[in-house]
Amino acid sequence: MWPPSHRQLCLAFLLVCVLSVISFFLHIHQDSFPHGLGLSILCPDRGLVTPPVAIFCLPGTAMGPNASSSCPQHPASLSGTWTVYPNGRFGNQMGQYATLLALAQLNGRRAFILPAMHAALAPVFRITLPVLAPEADSRTPWRELQLHDWMSEEYADLRDPFLKLSGFPCSWTFFHHLREQIRREFTLHDHLREEAQSVLGQLRLGRTGDRPRTFVGVHVRRGDYLQVMPQRWKGVVGDSAYLRQAMDWFRARHEAPVFVVTSNGMEWCKENIDTSQGDVTFAGDGQEATPWKDFALLTQCNHTIMTIGTFGFWAAYLAGGDTVYLANFTLPDSEFLKIFKPEAAFLPEWVGINADLSSLWTLAKP
């Protein structure tokens, strides 16, 4: 047994060593970030922790199924802070989220979303990326980078520690190598999935009254595209002839399918889609203010028919199965083809049916 004085000296020496080590590491962390950028993370369900950026976790930012807290942590090997502008509608923001997640992982950076994106996606999906506090957003020395809509070599070697992405990326070339992770991020909340499955479970084939064996989700994009495509992009939207061809493709390959139609132009669909075979149901509500209702229906189907747009892309990507899409829907000289590469937009195994461009060719004649 040491004498009391000797033990006290040893304890004091150990305490000084511990405090010195802690001070050294705190100094390193503080010097790694701009002056004034806080090191605290404010989470409603745990005490103070210290990653190198100030964020807060909004209620409902869930972690994985085995996690005990709703405030996600990034792996220690990641650094920096990346985020993305939440521009556009529902499908656009899904593309931005998936692209941010994939590029941040590829470059070894931490990814955060802004509150507006959380507000758009968290009520629908079990997303896990944490939310960047407005005060941290405003005090971070961002470099901004506008992405084009396909993966490029330079995106695999981005050195910026504080990067804010922008644009409307929605290409599988960014994130398809993480498909299972993306599907987990975009897992529907239980009540939305159960509600959609309940609707599908009540459907019957019109001619026989039997339960369908195969559900084919159909998304018909109309709305503002009716003006934007022909007037700005020299393009068309899906017409009744395309939808008939797409449905016939599935009828030839699947026994007793039912086509579950959703659209932001349901009246047009009811007037122009052939229902004579008793296998078409207009199940969507067409409300753009609550897109997740139609989206949930589409993702619970076995296969997909899409026209154009990111909403249809994501429904098809998450549903899996076969996908038929509208191909070559612009004239060859369309400016749209400078920002959109079909080979990067549609998975190679998806089936394209060419659009009817006759109305555009007529207008293009001198």
Swiss-Prot record:
Assigned GO CC terms: Golgi cisterna membrane
Broad EC category: transferase
EC numbers, comma separated: 2.4.1.69, 2.4.1.344
Membrane topology, from the record: Single-pass type II membrane protein
Keywords per UniProt: Glycoprotein, Glycosyltransferase, Golgi apparatus, Lipid metabolism, Membrane, Signal-anchor, Transferase, Transmembrane, Transmembrane helix
GO BP terms: carbohydrate metabolic process; fucosylation; lipid metabolic process; olfactory bulb development; positive regulation of cell-matrix adhesion; positive regulation of endothelial cell migration; positive regulation of endothelial cell-matrix adhesion via fibronectin; positive regulation of sprouting angiogenesis
Chief subcellular location: Golgi
Compartments (UniProt record): Golgi apparatus, Golgi stack membrane
Residues bearing attached sugar chains per UniProt: 66, 302, 328
Pathway: Protein modification; protein glycosylation
Catalyzed reactions: a beta-D-galactosyl-(1->4)-N-acetyl-beta-D-glucosaminyl derivative + GDP-beta-L-fucose = an alpha-L-Fuc-(1->2)-beta-D-Gal-(1->4)-beta-D-GlcNAc derivative + GDP + H(+); a ganglioside GA1 + GDP-beta-L-fucose = a ganglioside Fuc-GA1 + GDP + H(+); a beta-D-Gal-(1->3)-beta-D-GlcNAc-(1->3)-beta-D-Gal-(1->4)-beta-D-Glc-(1<->1')-Cer(d18:1(4E)) + GDP-beta-L-fucose = alpha-L-fucosyl-(1->2)- beta-D-galactosyl-(1->3)-N-acetyl-beta-D-glucosaminyl-(1->3)-beta-D-galactosyl-(1->4)-beta-D-glucosyl-(1<->1')-N-acylsphing-4-enine + GDP + H(+); a neolactoside nLc4Cer(d18:1(4E)) + GDP-beta-L-fucose = a neolactoside IV(2)-alpha-Fuc-nLc4Cer(d18:1(4E)) + GDP + H(+)
Pfam families reported for this sequence: Glyco_transf_11
Residues on Cytoplasmic side: 1-8
Gene Ontology MF terms in the entry: alpha-(1,2)-fucosyltransferase activity; galactoside 2-alpha-L-fucosyltransferase activity
Residue stretches in coiled coil: none
Domain of life: Eukaryota
InterPro entries given in the database record: Glyco_trans_11 (IPR002516)
Chain segments annotated as transmembrane: 9-25
Residue numbers on the Lumenal membrane side: 26-366
Entry keyword annotation includes Transferase: yes
PANTHER family (alphabetical): GALACTOSIDE 2-L-FUCOSYLTRANSFERASE, GALACTOSIDE ALPHA-(1,2)-FUCOSYLTRANSFERASE 1
Family listed: Belongs to the glycosyltransferase 11 family.
Function, in words: Catalyzes the transfer of L-fucose, from a guanosine diphosphate-beta-L-fucose, to the terminal galactose residue of glycoconjugates through an alpha(1,2) linkage leading to H antigen synthesis that is an intermediate substrate in the synthesis of ABO blood group antigens. H antigen is essential for maturation of the glomerular layer of the main olfactory bulb, in cell migration and early cell-cell contacts during tumor associated angiogenesis. Preferentially fucosylates soluble lactose and to a lesser extent fucosylates glycolipids gangliosides GA1 and GM1a.
Name of the protein in its database record: Galactoside alpha-(1,2)-fucosyltransferase 1
